[in-house]
């Protein structure tokens, strides 16, 4: 047994050494396109990860989401009140419920700087693990071109960069979202419980992924739904006697969460209030995007749920999240990280985002580019502060439009019984079989 383990370890080291040395040896033939792309993308991907997770984070930013978290867990450790903030200020506030405070409590046992760096490291690792799981979900490996391309693309975005620089928990939320989708796709009873546990843990911290509970409900995966409800209830109930004045969360913090603020808010309501849109127009836009979402979800459920579960789960998750950010009261740009599973569907033959309008929308909410025009502030403010809202809106419209025209084409060809995928796609799939 010992000899076998030693042999295996030696073979792994030998394989890694050979692969590293191979890059420096004279070639005996022309490299493949994939080899060239991997050689170009991996250094950029690795350095982007290091730059975002070390250089930018240690330099810091005026926006610091971790500071109120650290204050809260420090107060929790000392038995002091936590939910006593002044919400009239625009500084980041502590909004986690008592259960979230309990989960974050270990960070209060370290000094501020080590605690913050540990938090950043955990979120960086979570994003990288989520990237790996996404690759495996879509049948790619670490040796494929997709691996460095995905990592580079993720760490070049505003959502990942600001999550790490602002020191937010969204990296862990992304990992739990990917695990939730993977385990629902697995379908086994034990995996359904695990999926519910994963999304339930996110709900202990924030309700960001709450709309995704519709997926196990529609797919009759009641175990995941039960676990997703029970976990946050149990953790919060357990935390109540441990937190000083826990009811202040319900009387002070929760009304603030449910309200609408006109700063750092990319929802239709938030931007509508900021730019002074009439109430009727804000209401009309929210109803319009709810109708678009309903149409997209119905087409996805009717024609993809059983025939193409991967496409259904990932695309439906994107539709639900886009709707919630546009229509509900609060949405911030770095929430867009949760769309990575949806954006990965671009590699699927029947993807709804293989078109330039979809990626124009993605640019809007993923780019680090600033569009403020200091000489024309009226237009610059609109471009800068609305680009995320425009991007979310355009991507949701594109998704529904593609699905709707697929439906019309299939109906005209009298082939709705076989689904609504383009006619050319069915022969291609048959050939792959």
Swiss-Prot record:
GO biological processes: capsule polysaccharide biosynthetic process; cell wall organization
Disruption phenotype annotation: Cells lacking this gene result in an increased permeability and an altered cell wall.
UniProt keyword ATP-binding, yes or no: no
Membrane topology category: Multi-pass membrane protein
Cellular component annotations (GO), alphabetically ordered: plasma membrane
Localization per record: Cell membrane
Pathway: Cell wall biogenesis; cell wall polysaccharide biosynthesis
Similarity section: Belongs to the glycosyltransferase 87 family.
Biological role: Involved in the biosynthesis of the arabinogalactan (AG) region of the mycolylarabinogalactan-peptidoglycan (mAGP) complex, an essential component of the mycobacterial cell wall. It can also use (Z,Z)-farnesylphosphoryl D-arabinose (Z-FPA), and to a lesser extent (E,E,Z,Z,Z,Z)-heptaprenylphosphoryl D-arabinose (Z-HPA) and (Z)-nerylphosphoryl D-arabinose (Z-NPA) as sugar donors.
Protein's name in the database: Alpha-(1->3)-arabinofuranosyltransferase
